[in-house]
């Protein structure tokens, strides 16, 4: 009887993931269902909470981050059914009707929860809110949303000159703004648009490049009056708005699919079908880069579900080649850069990633961590101020590596370990549950 390829070991309330590829080689075949899109799940819960009437959400991500969002909005008066089934019911309380909570709102590890919620809290006059998060979130920059909100008249206080949580918010009647964001960030854009829902007049956000547009699509579906100018990367909300509850079907998260897209590309003999993947054009940078690297990808059964394009994606093993990733495409694949770094390790030539300094202020410094941990396994990666330089292909060797409690690091290292010689131990692998609770189980099933 052969030993299992993927095993979990509990160590002092942490979980180590041990991956030991067979000496005869490994191939991955079969169908994969991925969890609901995290970005869309957050927004469905939030808009459902502030809409009039009932919102039904199907396919919601049941990970830790949406639980944090639901918990916060329950504390402010919204009724949200338990996040343990495929059908979640949200009974909204209407725009401007969030109640002052009796305790601190805890966003957990979720930057999306904290940043988007700030736009709503700041626009609730005569109510006081305090927001915190875990140690990772308390170290992530919040000034990028606080500064534009303050320009609208918001009163927000925090550590390090109002840039770090915990944050205290005294709700105000805000003024409209035309904000030119220095970075392309869906969280910044969404925060300001959510604040603008309650403001008399036009609130506009202009970005230097296109960021993901899930908020715009969903706000329109819920009845908000939006104007979008794709030429100038501008979005305007006309307030005050009235939102009405909707039925939202959440597609699979392309950021979660990315791990299997790379695994199928780099593990010899692999042939995977990933079902029900959201292919919103503001998120498909991962597909464009993998195709540029020579990946064998086929989009099947393309369709639209509640305003979001969806497809099944087939990926087969191929010989990858290096490429350059920079400029306007980076905001469209920012969360996928850790797993693209893994792909680059096995690609012929030198892959250069630039304009990705945003990764230094995620759940971990993802540029530094991916360079350090993959180099530990034998990769040839040079860290740049805003990216990475990766020379391949190399043969990775099993090692002891750490997720730094960052879900995307944990899963990226697990995929790298599939193509390494000997055993790899990934410390604190339980972090994967933040966005993909079934990741380790799916990995075990594929490797049987």
From Swiss-Prot:
GO CC term (a single one): cytoplasm
An example Gene Ontology molecular-function term: 3-phosphoshikimate 1-carboxyvinyltransferase activity
Pfam families: EPSP_synthase (PF00275)
InterPro entries: Enolpyruvate_Tfrase_dom (IPR001986), Enolpyruvate_Tfrase_sf (IPR036968), EPSP_synthase (IPR006264), EPSP_synthase_CS (IPR023193), RNA3'P_cycl/enolpyr_Trfase_a/b (IPR013792)
Pathway: Metabolic intermediate biosynthesis; chorismate biosynthesis; chorismate from D-erythrose 4-phosphate and phosphoenolpyruvate: step 6/7
CDD domains, per the entry: EPSP_synthase (cd01556)
Catalytic residues (UniProt): 335
Binding site residues for 3-phosphoshikimate: 38-39, 43, 185, 187, 335, 362
Taxonomy, superkingdom: Bacteria
GO BP of this protein: amino acid biosynthetic process; aromatic amino acid family biosynthetic process; chorismate biosynthetic process
EC top class named in words: transferase
Protein's cellular compartments: Cytoplasm
Keywords linked to the UniProt accession: Amino-acid biosynthesis, Aromatic amino acid biosynthesis, Cytoplasm, Transferase
Cytoplasm listed as a keyword: yes
Keyword hit for Cytoplasm: yes
Any coiled-coil regions, as ranges: none
EC number: 2.5.1.19
UniProt function note: Catalyzes the transfer of the enolpyruvyl moiety of phosphoenolpyruvate (PEP) to the 5-hydroxyl of shikimate-3-phosphate (S3P) to produce enolpyruvyl shikimate-3-phosphate and inorganic phosphate.
Family label: Belongs to the EPSP synthase family.
Complex and partners: Monomer.
Record protein name field: 3-phosphoshikimate 1-carboxyvinyltransferase
């Amino acid at each position: 009887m052969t030993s299992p390829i993927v095993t979990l070991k509990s160590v002092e309330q942490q979980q180590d993931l041990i991956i030991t590829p067979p000496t005869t080689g490994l191939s991955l075949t079969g169908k994969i269902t991925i969890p609901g899109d995290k970005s869309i799940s957050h927004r469905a819960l939030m808009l459902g909470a502030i809409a009039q009437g009932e919102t039904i959400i199907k396919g919601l991500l049941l990970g830790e981050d949406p639980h944090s969002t639901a918990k916060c909005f329950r504390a402010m008066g919204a009724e949200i059914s338990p996040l343990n089934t495929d059908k979640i019911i949200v009974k909204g309380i209407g725009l401007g009707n969030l109640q002052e909570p009796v305790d601190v709102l805890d966003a957990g590890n979720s930057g999306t929860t904290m940043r988007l919620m700030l736009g709503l809290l700041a626009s609730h006059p005569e109510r006081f809110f305090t927001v915190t998060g875990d140690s990772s979130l308390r170290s992530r920059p919040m000034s990028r949303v606080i500064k534009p909100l303050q320009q609208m008249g918001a009163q927000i206080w925090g550590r390090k000159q109002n840039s770090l949580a915990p944050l205290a918010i005294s709700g105000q009647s805000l003024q409209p703004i035309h904000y030119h964001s220095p970075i392309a960030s869906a969280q910044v854009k969404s925060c300001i648009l959510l604040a603008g829902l309650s403001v008399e007049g036009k609130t506009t956000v202009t970005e230097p490049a296109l960021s993901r547009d899930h908020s715009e699509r969903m706000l329109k579906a819920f009845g908000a009056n939006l104007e979008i100018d794709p030429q100038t990367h501008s979005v305007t909300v006309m307030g005050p708005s009235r939102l009405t509850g909707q039925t939202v079907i959440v597609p699979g998260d392309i950021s979660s699919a990315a791990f299997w897209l790379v695994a199928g590309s780099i593990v010899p003999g692999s042939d995977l079908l990933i079902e029900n993947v959201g292919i919103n054009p503001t998120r498909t940078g991962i597909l464009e880069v993998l195709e540029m690297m020579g990946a064998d990808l086929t989009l099947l059964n393309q369709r639209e579900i509640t305003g979001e394009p969806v497809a099944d994606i087939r990926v087969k093993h191929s010989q990858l080649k290096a490429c350059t990733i920079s400029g306007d495409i980076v905001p469209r694949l920012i969360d996928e850069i850790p797993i693209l770094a893994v792909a680059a390790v096995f690609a012929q030539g030198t892959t250069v990633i630039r304009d990705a300094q945003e990764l230094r202020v995620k759940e971990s410094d993802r540029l530094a961590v991916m360079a350090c941990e993959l180099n530990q396994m034998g990769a040839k990666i040079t860290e740049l101020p805003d990216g990475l330089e990766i020379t391949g292909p190399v043969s990775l060797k099993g090692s002891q590596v750490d997720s730094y409690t960052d879900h995307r690091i944990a899963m990226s290292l697990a995929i790298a370990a599939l193509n390494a010689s000997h055993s790899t131990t990934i410390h604190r692998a339980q972090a994967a549950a933040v966005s993909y609770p079934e990741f380790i189980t799916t990995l075990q099933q594929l490797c049987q």
